[in-house]
């Protein structure tokens, strides 16, 4: 029982850390989009080249896409924190599935760019996030899906 509690505590702590990291990284991306900090498509092709090719409107659109993506990521990470902190810590099965779908599926879709777009640039981040999400969720399986917990929900 003691090891089960430790494993479950490890589970929700990992999920909170992953969700918190998403908030912090996305906040940095949001700041980069709003502040005009040097940015670019690739290390060789930055905002100045985008402006040369497409004008000021293209640069604003590029920065706007970064801001939009960052705000969505912050929103879903804050929701993941709330789901982890309250229902998941109570051992509610739906919360486990919700976290798997929201955190896991989003990273799988991000990894799909390797096949769909034939690019591996930026794959490390979703791969690491997916690995830690799966680690956190797998550590919670014994607590969330035990017979005792299933009987109390049924």
Which ranges hold each PLM region?
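Topology signature of small-to-medium multi-pass alpha-helical membrane proteins
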Residues: 1-154
